[in-house]
Each structure stands twice: as C-alpha cells, then as structure tokens.
Amino acid sequence: IEVWECEEGILTTGLQAAAQALPFLPWRGGVGTSLPEVNPDLKVFQDPICGETLIAVPPLKPDVTLLHAATSDAYGNVQHLGGPGWLDLFLYRAADRTIVQVERVIPNEEVRANPWATTIGGADAIVRAPYGAHPFYSRGFYVQDNDHLRLYTEAATAAAQDGRPEQLHAYLTQYCR
C-alpha cells in the first residue's frame, strides 16, 4: 500500500479531476501548509487570472471503488434513495471498476419503471448485502446505530491509546466475521 498524504478536500478534488478527465484541478485549501512538501504530487502555482496562490491537485484514479446503495438490478443500474452523495459520483466516474453493495437487488422492470431514480448506470459488480452499511445508515432501510458505534469507538480507543487490544479483538471477533 502506498501512502499519499492529503486532506479531505484534496482527496475529493483529485477524484473530481479524474472524474472529469482533467490533468489537475486547483484547490485553495492546503495553501501555506506542509502538504505540498510531504506530497510532491501537489504543486503550488499562481493563478494566471487573479494571481492567487493555489495548489494543483492531480487526478486520483482508483483501480476499484466500493460503494453502498439502496437497490440495483442485476445489470448494475444502481438507485440511491434520495440521490447519491457527490463523492459517490466522483468515485464511480474516477475508478476503473465499481463494485456496489446494495440492500436489495430488484428486477430490471422496476428500474425501467423509475429510470429517473437510477444514479449509477453500469456498475461492474453488484453484491446483495442487507445491512451492509451497518452500523451507519442506509436511507430508506435503517438508521445509524449509535450504540454500536459507541462500542466500536470504546474498543478502538482502548487499543490505540491505552495499548489494550483485547477489547478491540473481542469486538472484531463478535461483529466482523
């Protein structure tokens, strides 16, 4: 695994650049930080129109993107209830391949009856995974499980900060099989 140092804004900007097939996109965040020093792919430049200092963020093109959505047919026509987040669309458009786990696989006739609900057309693979987003929410199916997130946070904190991995190991053994 290669580490590519950045912050969230740079990550999304790089994905957007790849989704739009651009050589880079400008980003204001990170100007004046050490990010361009620790990540040589980030180039500081002067905006030729306004003269402002910006960072050129190159396209980030994942080999594979893994997403979660409400439903899809067997042909990869994905439907997010309430629409996808913009990051899902950037990831889908930037990646070479997209795998989407869904709460339900629906008949193609249902997709064709509601074509405006299709947010991603032609995902490379669909995996039926009821409760696949748990402990987070899946719109239209279940809400975020804050009690479960608290269990995980306590276990991870004990392992990371207190040097006690037993609680995290027990959590992973019980919930992540």
Please tell me what each predicted stretch does.
Residues I1-R177:
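Conserved alpha/beta enzyme-core scaffold
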